[in-house]
Amino acid sequence: MDFQDVNNVIESHPDMILKDKYIAIKKVNWLDKVTNIRKISKDLNIGLDSIIFIDDSPFEVNLVRSQLPELKVVKVPSKLHKYTEIMRNILGDFYNLTSSNEDESKTRIYKEQLKRHKIKKTFSNIDEYLSSLCLEISISENSNSIVDRISQISLKTNQFNLTTRRYTETDIFGFIEDTRYCVYSLSVCDKYGDYGSTGLAIILINGGIATIDSFLISCRIIGRYIEFSFIDYIINKMRDNNIEFLNAKYIKTGKNNQTENFYEDCGFDLIETSKTSKIYSLKLEKYTINGKKDYIEVIDE
C-alpha cells in the first residue's frame, strides 16, 4: 500500500469530496485497523469514544467492534440504495444544530497536535517537553460570548469530568445570570497553536460555602497538569470572595476513572464515599497552592 497512491486518489479522483486539507491524520500501512485506531487516538490525544469507524468489510467491522467497544462502528451497506438509511442513522454524530468557531477549526487543531506529538518523541523527560511548549491558560468568568462552546464541552467531555453533568446553552445562560453561580471557562494555547476553549468549572456559592457543581477539561489538554492550575485559580477566587469552605463531589461513570482521586491529590478532605461517588470538603485557609508546574502562565481575563 503506497502512501503516494492514496494521496493521488484523495486529490485527483473525481468522486473524492474530502481533500487533504480536511484530513487531520492518515495511517497508510499494513497494520490492522485496531492498532491504527489506537495510534490515531494517541497521536491526536482524543478518546476512543470520540472516534467513529466506517468500513465495508464485515471482518474489519467485527474485529474493531469486539476489540474497541468504546467506538461507534458503522458497516457500509453492500447495496447503494441503503446508503441513505445509514446516513440518516449516523447524522446526529456528525452534525450539530449550531457550530462554534472551534468546530470549524478542528482539523487545524488536530494537525497542531500531531506536531506536538512528533516533538514530544525527541524529549526523554516529560517536564522538559511540557516546559518547551510555553503553555498559557486564560480563564474567563461568566462569559456570554462562548456559551455555545461551554455547553459543548459539558455535553461531550467524558474522561476528565468529575460529575459529568450535561448542560445546554440555555442552562449555561441560566447559571451566568444567577448571582449564586460563577461559571469559569478555560482556554489554552502554546507555541504550536490554540487548543481553544477546553475547560469548565461551575461553582455554586451559598454564604461562606462554595460547591463545585462541575469541573472538567477536554481530553486534548490532559497530561499537561493544567487541571491543577485551574483549581488553584478557582480557589484563589473563592478566597477573594471570603469563602471559608469549598465542597466537591466525584461521581463515577465508568469513563472518568482517571479523575477519581483528583480532589484528594489537591488536598481536599474525603468526607463520604460509596461505590459510585465521593464527597469532599476543603477549608480554604489550609489550602496550599499546588503550583504543580511553574511553566504554565495563567492569564485572568
At which residue positions do the language-model features occur?
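A conserved beta-strand-loop-helix scaffold within acyl/acetyltransferase catalytic domains
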Residues: 3, 138-220
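Conserved Lys-Pro-Asp/Glu-containing loop-to-beta segment of HAD-superfamily phosphomonoesterases
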Residues: 37-58, 64
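Short acidic-hydrophobic, aromatic-tinged amphipathic segments that line or gate anion-handling sites
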Residues: 25-29, 73-76, 138-141
